[in-house]
Design a protein with these regions (language model features):
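Sec-dependent signal peptide recognition
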Residues: 1-5
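Generic structural microfeature
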Residues: 6, 19-21, 83, 100, ...
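Compositionally biased, intrinsically disordered/low-complexity regions enriched for serine, proline
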Residues: 6, 75-77, 132, 152, ...
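C-terminal motif of bacterial Sec signal peptides marking the signal peptidase cleavage site
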Residues: 9-10
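Compositionally biased, intrinsically disordered or flexible polar/acidic segments
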Residues: 15-168
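GH16 jelly-roll
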Residues: 167-400
Length: 400
């Protein structure tokens, strides 16, 4: 199911306020982030040695990553009993490759992140900001206890943010939803993309409008990828969108979904601008603009990824924004990652809250990514035009 809601004027704020519990800048001084979160000067952290990084990419708050601890790090902090979502901040300080620093993270006696390779997790980049959120950590003895265990080289940590779960604001008013409770896809809201393989991201699948790939049954939308020879491809799948039919500027967007698993799968719940040429400088009005090498509509006009999941890292959910100023080719992509249980076995709610001031992304109301409007130009914030839903499963490609 999917839903879109708007915040009623004068009824509060969509900002992720009120969920803050404790935050520290490891090895560094106190700092207030662009979204207003106050990180304290390091406390409650022992062991390891303090280091520094001169230049950081991929974050609106690079100061948080300029200091870090390396070694057998421990965190022991008094905190009220309860359930917390913990965001760990990392940046690889050394020019090393994938597999050259690997460690585990433990909280309250249990392993919460296994085989954490900062370079691998950050798209094989060093000196780039990485956040990993672990939800539902239960503290029952009045103290939060975290420690790190090395597998290869020494663990590192740049900052730590501890949150309580906040309820969804009652100020949202539902403006559109699709529960997929009919017998077929509602074509007044949805359209298919029918594409050959390799059109974007070097993906292996052909997108079709066949019911084998996209259908509504038993009260659910089903998007299904198949290994088969079809139209020059070795796989088929489905991709649908609401462009020109259900376009939205700001609001809360929710999708309840169960994801496919397996190496090579790359499902996504995401949004593109409904007028992709708003900030394009090299093209205008090209109907087939996606994957067009001479058109800079992407990344100029933006992209919001509410959920991406790649099969080789099951249960790792990614939320991302793409802009001209900050995208992957420049090592400056702004993104967050959360680890959940049963992404391919259970339904979870993937959500976006989007206002003129900021973008926040959630899974099951666990807040794990924020991007703030810096008040500069369209290059940093193209998110002032209507966007539309896209649902798809890619196969293979540059990431899958």
């Amino acid at each position: 199911s999917l839903a879109c809601a708007l915040l009623l004027p004068g009824c509060g704020s969509s900002e992720a306020a009120g969920d803050f519990a404790w935050a520290i800048n490891v090895g560094g001084e106190a700092y207030e982030t662009m979204d207003g979160t106050r990180f304290e000067q390091e406390s409650s952290v022992t062991r390891g040695t303090v280091g520094s990084i001169e230049t950081i990419k991929g974050s609106q708050d690079s100061f948080l990553y300029e200091s870090y601890r390396e070694g057998d790090i421990e965190v022991n902090h008094p905190i009220p009993n309860g359930t917390y979502d913990i965001t760990f901040h990392f940046a690889e300080p050394d020019e090393i490759g994938q597999g050259e620093r690997v460690f585990d993270v433990y909280a309250e006696g249990g392993r919460v992140i296994g085989d954490l390779d900062v370079v691998l997790f950050r798209d094989k980049k060093t000196v780039s900001a990485l956040t990993v959120t672990v939800p539902d950590v239960v503290v029952d003895d009045g103290e939060l206890n975290i420690h790190f265990a090395a597998s290869v080289n020494e663990p590192i940590l740049s900052a730590l943010l501890v949150r309580t779960r906040r309820p969804v604001s009652k100020s949202w008013e539902l403006v559109w939803s699709d529960e997929f409770d009919g017998d077929e896809l509602d074509t007044s809201s949805w359209s298919h993309n029918v594409w050959k393989p390799r059109k974007v991201n070097d993906e292996d699948q052909a997108y079709t409008a066949r019911p084998e790939n996209v259908r509504v049954e038993d009260g659910m939308l089903v998007i299904e990828a198949h290994k088969e020879d079809y139209d020059g491809a070795s796989y088929t799948s489905g991709r649908i969108h609401t462009s020109g039919k259900r376009d939205f500027l700001y609001g809360r967007f929710e999708a309840r979904a169960k994801l496919p698993g397996g190496q090579g799968t790359w499902p996504a719940i995401w949004m593109l601008p409904s007028d992709p040429f708003t900030y394009a400088t090299t093209c205008e009005g090209i109907e087939d603009w996606q994957g067009h090498d001479d058109c800079d509509a992407w990344p100029n006009s933006g992209e919001i990824d509410i959920m991406e999941h790649v099969g080789y890292q099951e249960d790792h959910i990614h939320g991302t924004v793409h802009t001209r100023a900050y995208y992957w080719k420049m090592w400056e992509q702004r993104k967050g990652r959360i680890l959940i249980d049963g992404a391919t076995e259970n339904f979870h709610v993937y959500a976006l809250e989007w206002t003129p001031e900021r973008i926040d992304i959630f899974v099951d109301d666990a807040h794990y990514f924020t991007y703030v409007n810096e008040g500069k130009t369209w290059r940093e914030w193209p998110f002032d035009e209507p966007f539309h839903w896209i649902l798809n499963i890619a196969v293979g490609g540059v990431w899958g």
